[in-house]
Amino acid sequence: CHEFNLTPHFFNSEYSRSSIQGGYQLAKELFRKPLDCTAVFAATDSNALGILTAADEMGIDIPGHLSLIGFDNISATALSRIDLTTVDQPKRVMAVQAVDMLRDKIENGTQGYVHQILLPTLIQRGTCRKLDPSK
């Protein structure tokens, strides 16, 4: 955002639950006014799929007029008609580490919290366009 002199805005709505329908309703609310943003980063891929549907119905070209990124990398996002750019969490690593921590707690009576930082991966597909920093 800094490189392009953009300020992120957070959009909360009564429709912000993590579902396709929630994303659809949220987008219908967001798209009622003229777009003053270049991209939407949805909380989940399900929300992004709903946003994609609403944008299509309202004639908003993704990625031509609006870039869209989801979060989760669910399998449907790779379908050619969807082709959603998303963020993939290291789910398998998360599961293995959670089981290891639970086993350690059961076997050794370990107390407290463990702070882990796991790096996500950006999966670049077809719903984002490159911005020109000179504009």
PLM region spans:
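Bacterial carbohydrate/catabolite-sensing allosteric modules
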Residues: 1-135
